[in-house]
């Protein structure tokens, strides 16, 4: 029986594909387990959403692109992580490792390669992240969400597979969504989210412009943990720090999204045909991957993009008005999008590329 190790973490985007694939593997009778950090968001997500999956925590260090004393400490954390992961993999004896990236994945990938366990990695953003650039040296294959990513990768290792979204995405219940928020059908619903960690900039934009926004929208505001402002109590405005199971119900009542531009999130909005205003993380906070993602979606007619350093009241409100003016054209473009690989197809490809015998075709 095929046994699959999964890894990836640090953000929701580095876990979501794994959350889609693991249940498919289980349905086929394969064994699966997860290797992640001790306190990362991946542990919380896996243990809460897939309680039957064994989770093995390892030491992990952050990968930084800038000079810092912390880099020296983290070298030792990564080395310990390799030893931790090697111990887990040696005992569990998986047939392959699937890595979704993020800093925690690097020691697991290195450990797998040292034990001759075939590795497949997945890159969601247009430009490969640092963790996947390192992991690529040890992997048999790297799969990409964006076709444009292929130009940054070796041809013999890279395959374009498109986005993989979770099963329950389209199962949201509008009645539940309205009950959760106290909203109704009388006015459009604007969903605001700043990524898994929240965004102070987006939160400020919304709160500063509530009077204007509430004239046109009912607002669901996902603020990020610890970023609620309980002093703001307005009709048509509902705050949550973070949601998991309830998100599909909230998306079911959403007409427009204001969001960061993480690849997994924006492909979920695309799958649901929800027009979006994307405010990507700036170069002062990231390597620019979200900027590239947002530009790609704007060029395809799926979204409007507002750079964070230009995100003032005037530009923000104008961008939302532009979406409403062009809503029919945006939705038309979105309806033409088709998923390239289903989750079942992707799992088959992983098994085939790592020379496993058990696939649907066999």
Swiss-Prot record:
It is found in: Cell membrane. GO terms for cellular component: plasma membrane. It is an enzyme of class 2 (transferase). Keywords: Cell cycle, Cell division, Cell membrane, Cell shape, Cell wall biogenesis/degradation, Glycosyltransferase, Membrane, Peptidoglycan synthesis, Transferase. GO terms for molecular function: undecaprenyldiphospho-muramoylpentapeptide beta-N-acetylglucosaminyltransferase activity. The keyword Magnesium does not apply. The keyword Repeat does not apply. Its EC number is 2.4.1.227. Its main location: membrane. UDP-N-acetyl-alpha-D-glucosamine binds at residues 166, 196, 290. Pathway: Cell wall biogenesis; peptidoglycan biosynthesis. One of its GO terms (biological process) is lipid glycosylation. It catalyses: Mur2Ac(oyl-L-Ala-gamma-D-Glu-L-Lys-D-Ala-D-Ala)-di-trans,octa-cis-undecaprenyl diphosphate + UDP-N-acetyl-alpha-D-glucosamine = beta-D-GlcNAc-(1->4)-Mur2Ac(oyl-L-Ala-gamma-D-Glu-L-Lys-D-Ala-D-Ala)-di-trans,octa-cis-undecaprenyl diphosphate + UDP + H(+). It is a peripheral membrane protein. PANTHER family: UDP-N-ACETYLGLUCOSAMINE--N-ACETYLMURAMYL-(PENTAPEPTIDE) PYROPHOSPHORYL-UNDECAPRENOL N-ACETYLGLUCOSAMINE TRANSFERASE (PTHR21015:SF27), UDP-N-ACETYLGLUCOSAMINE--N-ACETYLMURAMYL-(PENTAPEPTIDE) PYROPHOSPHORYL-UNDECAPRENOL N-ACETYLGLUCOSAMINE TRANSFERASE 1 (PTHR21015). Cell wall formation. Catalyzes the transfer of a GlcNAc subunit on undecaprenyl-pyrophosphoryl-MurNAc-pentapeptide (lipid intermediate I) to form undecaprenyl-pyrophosphoryl-MurNAc-(pentapeptide)GlcNAc (lipid intermediate II). Belongs to the glycosyltransferase 28 family. MurG subfamily. This is UDP-N-acetylglucosamine--N-acetylmuramyl-(pentapeptide) pyrophosphoryl-undecaprenol N-acetylglucosamine transferase. It comes from Staphylococcus carnosus (strain TM300).
């Amino acid at each position: 029986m095929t046994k699959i190790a999964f890894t990836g973490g640090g953000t929701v985007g580095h876990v979501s594909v794994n959350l889609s694939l693991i249940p498919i593997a289980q349905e086929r009778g394969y064994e699966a387990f997860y290797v992640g950090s001790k306190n990362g968001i991946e542990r919380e997500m896996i243990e809460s959403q897939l309680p039957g999956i064994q989770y093995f925590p390892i030491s992990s260090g952050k990968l930084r692109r800038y000079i810092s004393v912390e880099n020296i400490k983290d070298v030792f954390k990564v080395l310990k992580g390799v030893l931790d992961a090697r111990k887990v993999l040696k005992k569990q004896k998986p047939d392959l490792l699937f890595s979704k990236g993020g800093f925690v994945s690097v020691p697991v990938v290195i450990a797998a390669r040292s034990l001759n366990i075939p590795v497949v990695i997945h890159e969601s953003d247009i430009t490969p992240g640092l963790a996947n650039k390192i992991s690529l040296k040890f992997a048999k294959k790297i799969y990409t969400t964006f076709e444009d990513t292929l130009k940054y990768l070796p041809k013999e290792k890279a395959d374009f597979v498109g986005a993989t979204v979770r099963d329950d995405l389209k199962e949201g219940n509008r009645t539940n969504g309205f009950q959760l928020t106290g909203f109704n059908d009388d006015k459009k619903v604007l969903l605001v989210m700043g990524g898994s960690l929240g965004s102070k900039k987006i939160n400020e934009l919304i709160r500063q412009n509530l009077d204007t926004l509430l004239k046109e929208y009912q607002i669901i505001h996902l603020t990020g943990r610890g970023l609620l402002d309980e002093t703001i109590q307005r009709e048509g405005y509902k705050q949550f720090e973070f949601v998991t199971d309830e998100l599909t119900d909230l998306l079911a009542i959403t007409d427009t999204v204001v969001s960061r531009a993480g690849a997994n999130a924006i492909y979920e909005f695309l799958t649901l045909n929800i027009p979006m205003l994307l405010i990507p993380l700036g170069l002062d906070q990231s390597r620019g991957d979200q900027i590239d993602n947002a530009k790609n979606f704007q060029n395809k007619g799926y979204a409007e993009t507002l750079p964070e350093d230009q995100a003032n009241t005037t530009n923000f409100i104008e961008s939302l008005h532009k979406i409403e003016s062009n809503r029919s054209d945006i939705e038309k473009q979105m309806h033409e999008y088709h998923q390239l690989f289903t989750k079942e197809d992707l799992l088959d490809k992983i098994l085939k590329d790592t020379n496993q015998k058990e696939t649907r075709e066999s």
